[in-house]
């Protein structure tokens, strides 16, 4: 998976669709490093999206990913 990919994943008993913004090893603006096999995701509608910026556990584990959109 790469930055910019749109994924479908399970998060807190919901199925969500978001875009990968940071991949394993990337450093977030606050200095946090994205863990191995994890992703930091953002919704395309940033002003209304509940995404990694707001979750207590901000990273999406690879094992929770259900699908990747292919265009």
Residue ranges and their predicted role:
Residues 1-71:
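Extended hydrophobic leader/signal-anchor segments used for secretion and membrane insertion
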């Amino acid at each position: 998976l790469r930055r910019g990919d749109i994924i479908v994943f399970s998060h807190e008993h919901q199925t969500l669709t978001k875009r990968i913004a940071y991949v394993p090893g990337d450093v977030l603006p606050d200095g946090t490093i994205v863990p191995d096999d994890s992703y930091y995701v953002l919704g395309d509608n940033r002003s209304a999206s509940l995404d990694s910026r707001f979750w207590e556990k901000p990273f999406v584990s690879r094992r929770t990913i259900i699908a990747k959109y292919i265009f």
